[in-house]
């Protein structure tokens, strides 16, 4: 979880009741401050202190409700897995930043799809069928509770316009009540603002959430200025650091564009190629295809990975082309759980990242990676939704040209071997991504019978017709089509903003290399170990003064900078990270200030940093402090 809780995905811009105080009239709260205050207000409705933990699903559900959310069971299960023992306030802020409050317009739009007469009402029979058969199915008892609401039901119909108004009013009142409770409790007020006294004429504090994996927040004891200026930071005396180390690196403009990758003479070399894709999940995690590579004999190899160019409509944005890519090559050893890192594609020539070297015969794992500095959740709202289907004069349904163009792009992405056809194996990766299910042999046989195929593989036209059939099955309702598009990384304008397709090329001098897609899963676990190993092999290491077991490693790859924290002690430690003095930089956390918890005898990736604008000089300046 690395998204900014102060982003547009926050609780909204409702001004807290504290804005009536003299201090806040003079110094209006920023959007991030409003978000943080709303988070605290909701949390402190359930707990006495934000240092307490959420220890059950029920507590999480209640806290989200008090924050103006209406979480489904699916949403709760996403954040409270079988492995979850507790969630802290930091986790709660991150969840709220990702779970946007439902707007009235969104509610109305959803209900309108069931409003066959376009009169603002839905028959109880239709509503009951929809609520018990679709999505997260409701019980009959739950449906009856909705139908029996006196103010919004009459004559066998459900008035969804009144319901939406009631829903929004209730949600706003819930949040307002929590804020009033926070305002009324001066003790909680002092806890929120640390040592900063109410009514101070100098400036308003900006409590800044600092989320990250394995974080224990201590925001109750520390606040920061809204501009992130350390000279104005309001640090309470309860926040103490035992020791600190700092790193400063100045990178010249275009330094990361210089060609450090030299392509060998590939005239007589043999090549294998495969495509793949990074997909950004709702929680900020990245999922991608992963591969096995077989080398028949010892040979010099040239491996590259780069974003995949798709045939685009003129004028359409291609944000994924600027996403950084890398490929880590691992080999199994005596301990299958600990494969050996052989190399990774750290050299660059424009958008291509590559590696040249010799490898022995054998089977290798190829794990793609992206830092997360460029591939981020889209925050800019889409003003106009693209049309996916339309009916002609005869009433026959067809796909719009814009949607057909997008489906053609998706076809290129899922055609992993690049032969212009979709095999059952390739189609299953697509199905797993969009529906979570596989297509068995019998279903594939039916698919081949009904849609255009060649050599038992689906053609581009067959892929189009498959989605047209889906639209017809839903009588033109594009809901399922949008689920597919969102799963593949497209927004409502049919722009690919939350995925990055890529292509891998493997050249071998002495044999024919082979590559096979074996998984599509989260880029974590083995990848994090590989990244840590690559940094440890060549980093600038600094030991925390007086704490020789705590080491910060920073590695400059020209294109990006990676830092990891090594904890050799027998106790967990909390490290506070401050990037505020960095210039023209963006990191994968999305925040300048955050804290991480490092488990005993472990090493973890702290952050990746890249230039915001590659045409300008960028300065990496970071202070790592051990929290007392």
Swiss-Prot record:
GO terms for molecular function: calcium ion binding. One of its GO terms (cellular component) is ciliary membrane. Residues 1-24, 192-231 are annotated as: Disordered. Its main location: membrane. It is found in: Cell projection, Cilium membrane. Residues 1-22, 222-231 have a biased composition (Polar residues). It comes from the Eukaryota. Transmembrane segments: none annotated. Keywords: Calcium, Cell membrane, Cell projection, Membrane, Metal-binding, Phosphoprotein, Repeat. The keyword Metal-binding applies. Residues 102-137, 138-173, 402-437 form the EF-hand domain. InterPro entries: EF-hand-dom_pair, EF_Hand_1_Ca_BS, EF_hand_dom, Miro-EF-hand_domain. Ca(2+) binds at residues 415, 417, 419, 426. Component of the EvC complex composed of EFCAB7, IQCE, EVC2 and EVC; built from two subcomplexes, EVC2:EVC and EFCAB7:IQCE. Interacts (via EF-hand 1 and 2) with IQCE (via N-terminus); this interaction anchors the EVC-EVC2 complex in a signaling microdomain at the base of cilia and stimulates the Hedgehog (Hh) pathway. Interacts with EVC2 (via N-terminal end). Interacts with EVC. Component of the EvC complex that positively regulates ciliary Hedgehog (Hh) signaling. Required for the localization of the EVC2:EVC subcomplex at the base of primary cilia. This is EF-hand calcium-binding domain-containing protein 7. It comes from Mus musculus (Mouse). The lineage of its organism: Eukaryota, Metazoa, Chordata, Craniata, Vertebrata.
């Amino acid at each position: 979880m690395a998204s900014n809780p102060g982003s547009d995905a926050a609780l909204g811009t409702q001004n807290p009741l504290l804005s009536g105080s003299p201090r806040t009239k003079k110094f209006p709260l920023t959007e991030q401050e409003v978000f943080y205050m709303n988070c605290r207000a909701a949390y402190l409705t359930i707990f006495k202190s934000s240092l307490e933990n959420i220890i059950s699903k029920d507590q999480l559900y209640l806290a989200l409700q008090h924050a103006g959310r209406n979480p489904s069971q699916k949403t709760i299960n996403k954040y409270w897995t079988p492995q979850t023992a507790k969630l802290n306030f930091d986790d709660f802020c991150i969840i709220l930043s990702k779970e946007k409050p439902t707007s009235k317009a969104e509610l109305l739009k959803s209900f309108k799809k069931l409003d066959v007469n376009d009169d603002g009402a839905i028959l109880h029979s239709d509503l009951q069928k929809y609520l018990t058969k679709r999505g997260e199915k409701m019980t009959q008892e739950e449906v009856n509770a909705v139908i029996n609401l006196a103010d919004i039901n009459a004559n066998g119909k459900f008035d969804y316009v009144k319901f939406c108004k009631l829903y929004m009013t209730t949600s706003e009142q819930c949040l307002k009540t929590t804020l009033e409770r926070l305002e009324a409790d001066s003790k909680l007020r002092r806890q929120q603002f640390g040592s900063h006294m109410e009514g101070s004429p100098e400036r308003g504090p900006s409590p800044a959430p600092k989320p990250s994996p394995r974080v224990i927040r201590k925001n109750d004891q520390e606040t920061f200025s809204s501009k992130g200026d350390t000279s104005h930071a309001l640090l309470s005396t309860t926040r103490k650091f035992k020791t600190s180390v700092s790193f400063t690196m100045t990178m010249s403009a275009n330094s990361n564009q210089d060609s450090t990758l030299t392509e060998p003479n590939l005239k007589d070399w043999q090549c294998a190629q495969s495509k793949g894709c990074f997909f950004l999940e709702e929680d900020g995690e990245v999922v991608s295809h992963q591969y096995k590579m077989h080398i028949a004999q010892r040979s010099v190899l040239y491996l590259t990975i780069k974003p995949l160019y798709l045939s685009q409509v003129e004028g359409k944005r291609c944000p994924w082309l600027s996403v950084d890519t890398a490929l880590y090559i691992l080999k199994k050893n005596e301990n299958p759980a600990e494969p050996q890192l052989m190399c990774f594609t750290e050299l660059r020539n424009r958008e291509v990242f590559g590696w040249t070297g010799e490898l022995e015969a054998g089977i290798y794992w190829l794990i793609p990676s992206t830092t997360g500095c460029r591939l981020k959740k889209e925050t800019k709202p889409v003003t106009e939704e693209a049309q996916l289907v339309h009916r002609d004069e005869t009433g026959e349904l067809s796909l719009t040209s814009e949607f057909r163009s997008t489906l053609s792009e998706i076809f290129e992405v899922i055609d992993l071997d690049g032969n212009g056809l979709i095999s059952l194996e390739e189609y299953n990766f697509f199905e797993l991504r969009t529906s979570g299910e596989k297509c068995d042999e019998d279903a594939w046989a039916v698919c081949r019978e009904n849609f255009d195929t060649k050599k038992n593989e689906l053609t581009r036209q067959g892929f189009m017709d498959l989605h047209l059939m889906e639209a017809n099955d839903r009588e033109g309702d594009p809901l399922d089509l949008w689920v597919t598009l969102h799963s593949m990384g497209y927004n409502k304008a049919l722009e690919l903003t939350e995925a990055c397709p890529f292509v891998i090329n493997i050249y071998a001098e002495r044999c024919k290399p082979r590559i096979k897609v074996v998984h599509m899963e989260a880029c974590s676990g083995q990848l994090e170990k590989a990244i840590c190993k690559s940094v440890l092999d060549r980093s600038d290491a600094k030991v925390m003064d007086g704490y020789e077991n705590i080491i910060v490693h920073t590695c400059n790859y020209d294109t990006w900078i990676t830092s990891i924290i090594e904890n050799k002690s027998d106790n967990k430690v909390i490290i506070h990270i401050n990037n505020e003095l960095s210039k023209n930089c963006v990191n994968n956390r999305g925040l300048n200030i955050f804290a991480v918890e490092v488990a005993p005898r472990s090493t973890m990736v702290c952050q990746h940093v890249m230039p915001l604008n590659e045409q300008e000089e960028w300065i990496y300046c970071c202070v790592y402090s051990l929290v007392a």
